[in-house]
Amino acid sequence: MVSVKPLKFEDDELLLLDQRKLPGKEEYFTCKTYQDVHFAIKEMVCRGAPLIGAVGAYGVALACREFINESQEKFQQETKRAISELSSARPTAVNLFWALNKMNKLLGQVMEENTAPEDIYPIILNEAHKISDQELQRNYRIAEFGDQVISNGDKILTHCNTGALATTGYGTALGVIRQAHYNHKDIFVYVDETRPRLQGAKLTAWELKQEQLPFALIPDSSAAVLIKNGDIDVIFVGADRIASNGDTANKIGTFMLSILAKKYKVPFYVVAPVSTIDFQAKNGDDITIEERSSKEVTEIDGVRVAPTDIQVYNPAFDITPAENITGIITEKGIIGPNNREIMTIQE
């Protein structure tokens, strides 16, 4: 079974496997305050929608610990500010907002009961543990459903990193692939390098190598040739936010793959927990797309590879329209990418 631990909570500190340093170094980044958590999410020490949701929850717990000696009024003000700051770390992944809303609601309940700040911290910390543990259990259920659409001998294409590193320990799209491998299916995986941050090359390849699961790393630009030549049987991708009509925001390059999949009639599955669905978003137009630093495109590991004084467009995500998606694999089953089926699984 997978041994990757993307996060640990020990001695009132959150330890995050620093994904910026993989695959070269396996080091943990220590978060002692909610500000550390904000930095870790924003600067992609940790990444992946399900994981940053859990990490955000721990950020609220650390804020409660930080202000444990304040008056109830001051405690309430500071924790509210902390939640607001944490929510600004990254705008697209809805799991972060889902987790923060859950923590904020619980905080409001315990504050209404006039609970002392020193007694609130363990309650909030326990809730963060629950969110993290439940996320892992969701991954297992997702993997069981997803394995049903993988046949022995399948050649699979995946994009970005959707494994243990993107969740609290198993994976969404990569978790489905992992489950098929554990069930002794003869599969082969093609991994997009996923520019510009190379999550496929640095993270997914690292996870698959640890699992001894047969794979090949490919340039993003070669996916079309593989699909056209009939070398891909099914495509699995993750999601950062799914609108109520099935439109899906995911790592930049996903939309391009979905167009190819539709043209060449290759099944294209989005894999995500229900917490990734934004039931308030009518369609992809309601989803904010994060734009990141130009340095992610013009530099590789700090070395300039492009001319200076040029314009750069670097969206972190794109929107795949529902009509390009075969199905959405969740912990509640495989559903169609449409409003009717999506609304039936609303929590």
UniProtKB/Swiss-Prot annotation:
Gene Ontology BP, a term: L-methionine salvage from methylthioadenosine
Residues reported to bind substrate: 47-49, 90, 199, 250-251
EC number: 5.3.1.23
Keyword line: Amino-acid biosynthesis, Isomerase, Methionine biosynthesis
A GO molecular-function annotation: S-methyl-5-thioribose-1-phosphate isomerase activity
Class of this enzyme: isomerase
Site (Transition state stabilizer): 160
SUPFAM superfamilies, alphabetized: NagB/RpiA/CoA transferase-like
Pathway: Amino-acid biosynthesis; L-methionine biosynthesis via salvage pathway; L-methionine from S-methyl-5-thio-alpha-D-ribose 1-phosphate: step 1/6
Active site feature: 240 (proton donor)
UniProt cross-references to Pfam families, sorted A to Z: IF-2B
Catalytic activity: 5-(methylsulfanyl)-alpha-D-ribose 1-phosphate = 5-(methylsulfanyl)-D-ribulose 1-phosphate
Function summary: Catalyzes the interconversion of methylthioribose-1-phosphate (MTR-1-P) into methylthioribulose-1-phosphate (MTRu-1-P).
Protein family (similarity comment): Belongs to the eIF-2B alpha/beta/delta subunits family. MtnA subfamily.
Name listed for the protein in its UniProt record: Methylthioribose-1-phosphate isomerase
